[in-house]
């Protein structure tokens, strides 16, 4: 079965309603039922609870508490690199931005402007730059950390669809990451501007950042923007910057001539938070 045929049911599903329902259920305090659901999830997806700061499944009051669990201190040491991996997951795609085009999958490209909510001025900063797309599976740790030091410039919530973001859907839905709901975070870094985009998906109940809290819901259907030029929101490499309540994808954009990705960083490669991702060009 081709990927395009495999994803056809997703066009018919009431994705917004499913996501709203999943969000309510994930935040519900249902006692033993919550514990049973978490146990089932751990078994189904092979979640390694020995990595969790709190491995006691029965102690989580809600599914969201479990899903956004912290790791044991020191479990993901930071490599000595200009850019470290911001999440646990697997590389979806990685490489150069060809003018303004980002590679999604064979036969599928999308533009930086589309990803960034139609902001051509922001997109121009990444012309002929570099990108990395990392998929977080259900079993992964779902907090996002800073790949390098950065000062927050602005944050945009871009409404959109809620397709799944698994590899099959990435191959079957054109412009997937520029169609789905997303939170765009623009930072000024020692490498120049960096965009860190949190992409939503089916049953991703919400996305949150450490400086704002929960960004969505509400889902107003209208783009929202927060400017931080007059506020000092500075995060260091490795600091937590946000989290998904149910899993999804992050997309990183760097300007031209800023970074060179480490050897072996290619599609389908499993990656872990803190490992060396890229070095600064010219060093």
From Swiss-Prot:
Keywords attached to this entry: Cell membrane, Decarboxylase, Lipid biosynthesis, Lipid metabolism, Lyase, Membrane, Phospholipid biosynthesis, Phospholipid metabolism, Pyruvate, Zymogen
Cofactor binding, note field: Binds 1 pyruvoyl group covalently per subunit.
Subcellular location field: Cell membrane
Pfam families, per database record: PS_Dcarbxylase
Documented EC number(s): 4.1.1.65
UniProt modification remark: Is synthesized initially as an inactive proenzyme. Formation of the active enzyme involves a self-maturation process in which the active site pyruvoyl group is generated from an internal serine residue via an autocatalytic post-translational modification. Two non-identical subunits are generated from the proenzyme in this reaction, and the pyruvate is formed at the N-terminus of the alpha chain, which is derived from the carboxyl end of the proenzyme.
InterPro entries: PS_Dcarbxylase, PSD-B, PSD_type1_pro
Active site (catalytic residues): 88 (charge relay system), 145 (charge relay system), 248 (charge relay system), 248 (schiff-base intermediate with substrate)
Reactions catalysed: a 1,2-diacyl-sn-glycero-3-phospho-L-serine + H(+) = a 1,2-diacyl-sn-glycero-3-phosphoethanolamine + CO2
Record-level Gene Ontology MF annotations: phosphatidylserine decarboxylase activity
Biological processes annotated in GO: phosphatidylethanolamine biosynthetic process
Pathway: Phospholipid metabolism; phosphatidylethanolamine biosynthesis; phosphatidylethanolamine from CDP-diacylglycerol: step 2/2
HAMAP family: PS_decarb_PSD_B_type1 (MF_00662)
NCBIfam families linked: PS_decarb (TIGR00163)
Subunit structure of this chain's protein: Heterodimer of a large membrane-associated beta subunit and a small pyruvoyl-containing alpha subunit.
Record's protein name: Phosphatidylserine decarboxylase proenzyme
Gene (name only): psd
